[in-house]
């Protein structure tokens, strides 16, 4: 396992500045933010250190991205884009899906082979209805990932932290029972988990047991400290 960080915390930095910092601080890898150029709807979104669309269109730019990573001695562990591709807003949904596909193609072109994201959630629907929506929205995305030989790692964050994320949150894949259902629907070796145990702690879920049951599905890991104040 290699230690790195998600680059969305360095909003306003260039790709080169971010890579230089990672190298100087001794990080082995980075999960590189690849949001489209747009106004951020929430904290840590809207950050882009790699322009995925440009990667797919500009061979010289793509070569520079990889050459600079090699020069810095820092591996790109994944391309990161965490939208809600199952939002009830069809215009936003379609835009998010298209950009996610661009990120998948860019991951292939750069030789990264990993994209980290959310499964999404329609906040107007219950869990069962959202599972039906997974059947509608995700198969073409997974098919593209398979064709590109890119793994998709879904983070287990509920995305339930603000008024705009209520009710239900914006990410369906938040508990092991739902993981089982989604993996039945999307039976692919290219779909797995970006495992973040901190989200299980505040949901009062065992964060060790899933490591054994889903050991073959854990593609990437987020690790952060957390403390529950019960008062």
Language-model region placement:
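Hydrophobic faces of well-ordered beta-strands that scaffold small-molecule active sites
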Residues: 3-7, 28-32, 76-81, 115-117, ...
